[in-house]
Amino acid sequence: MPTIQQLVRIGRTKMTKKSKSVALDSCPQRRGVCTRVYTTTPKKPNSAMRKVARVRLTNGNEVNAYIPGEGHNLQEHSIVLVRGGRVKDLPGVRYHIVRGALDTSGVAGRTQRRSKYGAKRPKEAKK
């Protein structure tokens, strides 16, 4: 326990918060080019074929990014926008690809949570 005089002289050291998305270099999103688009299986209790892309960002970093939603149009050399956000059951996947931005199309036929998947507002049905 420091004395008051020691605190006056030196003060307390601030705890620095470590970023969970280091490759973005303190930016909200980064542009990148897909180097590989593939599917992978999740960790133990879950079972699926999760769509993932290996992306080379504009700052030179290579990351694994998850492709959310049903169906996608990504292939090698597609330009994508990458945001932070991990996928809990995929080890090593700490980034998400933004749907509806750059070369990535929005999810077709999506009616709810459309903004998260880059889907346009559906046309109203005639009464």
Curated annotation (Swiss-Prot):
Keywords: Methylation, Ribonucleoprotein, Ribosomal protein, RNA-binding, rRNA-binding, tRNA-binding. This is Small ribosomal subunit protein uS12. Belongs to the universal ribosomal protein uS12 family. The modification 3-methylthioaspartic acid is found at residue 89. SUPFAM superfamilies: Nucleic acid-binding proteins. GO terms for cellular component: small ribosomal subunit. Residues 101-127 are annotated as: Disordered. With S4 and S5 plays an important role in translational accuracy.
